[in-house]
């Protein structure tokens, strides 16, 4: 049984670290988190969705003005936390109770790690909402600076999220190890009591690791289906938002063209107003000059004679 539980731990944790390190490289296409626990699959889907938003062009990033993106992230956060809780409860059912003091300590540490991870995911969603507000305030202006700050914040939040996700993995492993040791101690006591009977005939039992693995796979398929549905709906909504942004851009360009034409027409009108006035002033000035010259006895065409 100890060997089976050791194999289970290796199966649960294998590949997790490698995939976490791959996540740091934004350009790599992530796997579908099939080798992980349901809560890790949900977390992976959360970041895959966010990464997909980051890869959009600057023009399309303005789609974040719609609050639907943050609502989809909220749904993924709730799904992740739900699967973490379900996984912890499943561990408790499979391996049985442990010492009350140990269980209280491990549960407290696990809840703290879970809260940190949830806080990191909420910070990501909050930062996107803040960007949406700032972008609305700067509508029609250059948003390169806002997008740069958003990318910088998301990189920092990503590092913190991955760090706390790894910490939660370790806490779950410790919790599982503690419950497994308690179960093994109970099995050892039963083995000592039933030793003579076991000599007469071997006991047959279904390995608990098999049941846990099957349930984990079932959860994975169920959650994967939900998240794929959510992702598909989100992409459809973003496509609609992209079309709306294109329509808005066309309207803005049309209005700008109309304003430009109106300005040109107004300029022409002003010119038609003031041109006769200027011409009239020029005529009056020429007339005044002639009168002054006439009064002084100066002919406009007469040149002063040279003194011999």
UniProtKB/Swiss-Prot annotation:
Q: Which domain of life is it from?
A: Eukaryota
> What keywords appear on the UniProt entry?
Chylomicron, Endosome, Extracellular matrix, Glycoprotein, HDL, Heparin-binding, Lipid transport, Lipid-binding, Oxidation, Phosphoprotein, Repeat, Secreted, Signal, Transport, VLDL
Covalent S-S links between cysteines: none
Q: What is any Pfam family matched here?
A: Apolipoprotein
Does the entry feature the keyword Repeat, yes or no?
yes
Where is the protein situated, by its record's location annotation? Answer: Secreted; Secreted, Extracellular space; Secreted, Extracellular space, Extracellular matrix; Extracellular vesicle
Instruction: Cite the post-translational modification comment.
Output: APOE exists as multiple glycosylated and sialylated glycoforms within cells and in plasma. The extent of glycosylation and sialylation are tissue and context specific. Glycated in plasma VLDL.
Stretch list, region Homooligomerization: 257-308
- Single Gene Ontology MF annotation: heparin binding
Gene Ontology CC, one term: high-density lipoprotein particle
Q: Where does heparin bind?
A: 157-160, 220-227
What are the boundaries of the region LDL and other lipoprotein receptors binding? Answer: 153-163
Q: Is Glycoprotein there in the keyword field?
A: yes
GO biological process terms on file: acylglycerol homeostasis; cholesterol efflux; cholesterol metabolic process; lipoprotein metabolic process; melanosome organization; phospholipid efflux
InterPro entries, alphabetized: ApoA_E, Apolipoprotein_A1/A4/E
Positions of the sequence repeats? 75-96, 97-118, 119-140, 141-162, 163-184, 185-206, 207-224, 225-246
The region called Lipid-binding and lipoprotein association is annotated at 205-281
Q: Which family does it belong to?
A: Belongs to the apolipoprotein A1/A4/E family.
**General function of this protein:** APOE is an apolipoprotein, a protein associating with lipid particles, that mainly functions in lipoprotein-mediated lipid transport between organs via the plasma and interstitial fluids. APOE is a core component of plasma lipoproteins and is involved in their production, conversion and clearance. Apolipoproteins are amphipathic molecules that interact both with lipids of the lipoprotein particle core and the aqueous environment of the plasma.
Spell out the protein name for this chain: Apolipoprotein E
Q: Which organism is it from?
A: Pteropus vampyrus
Q: What is the lineage of its organism?
A: Eukaryota, Metazoa, Chordata, Craniata, Vertebrata
């Amino acid at each position: 049984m100890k060997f089976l539980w050791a194999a289970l731990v290796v199966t649960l944790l294998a590949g997790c670290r490698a995939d976490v390190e791959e996540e740091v490289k934004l350009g790599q296409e992530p796997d579908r988190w099939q080798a992980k626990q349901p809560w890790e699959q949900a977390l992976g889907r959360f970041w895959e969705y966010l990464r997909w938003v980051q890869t959009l062009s600057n023009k399309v990033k303005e789609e974040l003005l719609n609050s639907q993106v943050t609502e989809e992230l909220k749904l993924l956060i709730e799904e992740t936390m739900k699967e973490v809780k379900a996984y912890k409860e499943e561990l408790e059912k499979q391996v049985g109770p442990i010492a009350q003091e140990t269980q209280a300590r491990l549960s407290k540490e696990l809840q703290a790690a879970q809260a940190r991870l949830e806080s990191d995911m909420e910070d990501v969603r909050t930062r996107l909402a803040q960007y949406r507000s700032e972008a609305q305030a700067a509508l029609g202006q250059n948003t390169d600076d806002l997008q740069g700050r958003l990318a910088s914040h998301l990189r920092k939040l990503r590092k913190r999220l991955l760090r706390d996700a790894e910490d939660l993995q370790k806490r779950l492993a410790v919790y599982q190890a503690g419950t497994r040791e308690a179960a093994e101690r109970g099995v050892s006591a039963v083995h000592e009591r039933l030793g003579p009977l076991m000599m007469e005939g071997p006991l047959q039992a279904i390995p608990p690791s098999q049941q846990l693995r099957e349930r984990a796979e079932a959860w994975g398929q169920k959650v994967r289906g939900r998240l794929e549905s959510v992702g598909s709906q989100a992409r459809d909504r973003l496509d609609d938002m992209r079309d709306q942004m294109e329509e808005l851009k066309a309207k803005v360009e049309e209005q700008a063209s109309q304003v430009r034409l109106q300005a040109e027409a107004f300029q022409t009108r002003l010119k038609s107003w003031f041109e006769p006035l200027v011409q009239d002033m020029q005529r009056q000035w020429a007339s005044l000059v002639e009168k002054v010259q006439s009064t002084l006895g100066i002919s406009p065409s007469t040149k002063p004679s040279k003194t011999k």
